[in-house]
């Protein structure tokens, strides 16, 4: 069922049909991927965007790798059957670390993943101490440790895995206040350090949504680093050099996996990000 947004008594009108534009899917388990989408849209405003979020299986951080791979492939397949894709962005660190090989094997369009911005953080740190703030799944996965060994072996890496911060970011987009006390409790291991990290990698796409609150809690001068801008640049290059000619003149659309009250409450948020319609996506499996 498609749901149009209302603003007071003014109906939300669909966008005027335009020239066909390359269709780009941005996918996440929740709404954290909107932070990545926002960076891509800033660089590439004239694309046809689809945002899909898996509110049935959210969050992915505690799910098995086999489940995540099967689920992500099924969702991208379902979107591709509705709209031929020029490119897909898996805007979820957890899903990216395990599902990219399967996606790239199945589809002929480029698939971009999101990985923790450890390499730029290692370049930016002044005291040699880098914090990685991510889900527990990302913190534990061997891929993350390989990135650290490759790009930050001369740094002291302090890792914190938190599922609660994902929930805080989702709640913020639903209009709820973010508890600074909750953030202080989550970050307590760093806040108690004699010399805490001066550079923090936001290793989950939900966490840039909490940037304002994090800067209030972390020591003054702490740098926050995420992958959004780099993903946008990579997307632009691939669309120019490798993407198939898959275009649509339709308005931007968002897909959820179940039309729950929580999903419906996100309609005003999605409209602010430029998505005219929210629909339930039928996924096999």
From Swiss-Prot:
It comes from the Bacteria. Pathway: Cell wall biogenesis; peptidoglycan biosynthesis. GO terms for biological process: cell wall organization; peptidoglycan biosynthetic process; regulation of cell shape. Pfam families: Asp_Glu_race. One of its GO terms (molecular function) is glutamate racemase activity. Signal peptide: none annotated. Disulfide bonds: none annotated. Substrate binds at residues 28-29, 60-61, 93-94, 205-206. The active site is at residues 92, 204. UDP-N-acetyl-alpha-D-muramoyl-L-alanine binds at residues 104, 113-119. The low basal catalytic activity in increased 1000-fold in the presence of UDP-MurNAc-L-Ala, the product of the preceding enzyme in the peptidoglycan biosynthesis. It is an enzyme of class 5 (isomerase). It catalyses: L-glutamate = D-glutamate. HAMAP family: Glu_racemase. Provides the (R)-glutamate required for cell wall biosynthesis. Monomer. This is Glutamate racemase. It comes from Escherichia coli (strain K12). The lineage of its organism: Bacteria, Pseudomonadati, Pseudomonadota, Gammaproteobacteria, Enterobacterales.
């Amino acid at each position: 069922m498609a749901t149009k947004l209302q603003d007071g008594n003014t109906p939300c009108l669909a966008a005027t049909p335009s020239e066909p534009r390359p269709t780009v899917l941005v996918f996440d388990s929740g709404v954290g991927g909107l932070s990545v989408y926002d960076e891509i849209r800033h660089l590439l405003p004239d694309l046809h965007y689809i945002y899909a979020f898996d509110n049935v299986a959210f969050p992915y951080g505690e799910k098995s790798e086999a489940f995540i791979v099967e689920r992500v492939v099924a969702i991208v397949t379902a979107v591709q059957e509705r709209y031929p894709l020029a490119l897909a962005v898996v805007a979820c660190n957890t899903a990216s670390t395990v599902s990219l090989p399967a996606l790239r094997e199945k589809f002929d369009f480029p698939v971009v993943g999101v990985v923790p911005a450890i390499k730029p953080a290692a370049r930016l740190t002044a005291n040699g101490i880098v914090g990685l703030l991510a889900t527990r799944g990302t913190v534990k996965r061997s891929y993350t440790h390989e990135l650290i060994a490759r790009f930050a072996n001369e740094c002291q890496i302090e890792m914190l895995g938190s599922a609660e911060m994902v929930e805080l970011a989702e709640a913020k987009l639903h209009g709820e206040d973010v508890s600074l006390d909750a953030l202080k409790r989550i970050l307590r291991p760093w806040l108690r350090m004699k010399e805490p990290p001066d550079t923090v990698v936001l290793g989950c796409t939900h966490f840039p949504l909490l940037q304002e609150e994090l800067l209030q809690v972390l020591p003054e001068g702490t740098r926050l680093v995420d992958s959004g801008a780099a993903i946008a640049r990579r997307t632009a290059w691939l669309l120019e050099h490798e993407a198939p000619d898959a275009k649509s003149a339709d308005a931007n659309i968002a897909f959820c996996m179940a039309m729950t009250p929580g999903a419906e409450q996100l309609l005003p948020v999605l409209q602010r990000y430029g998505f005219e319609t929210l629909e339930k996506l039928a996924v096999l499996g």
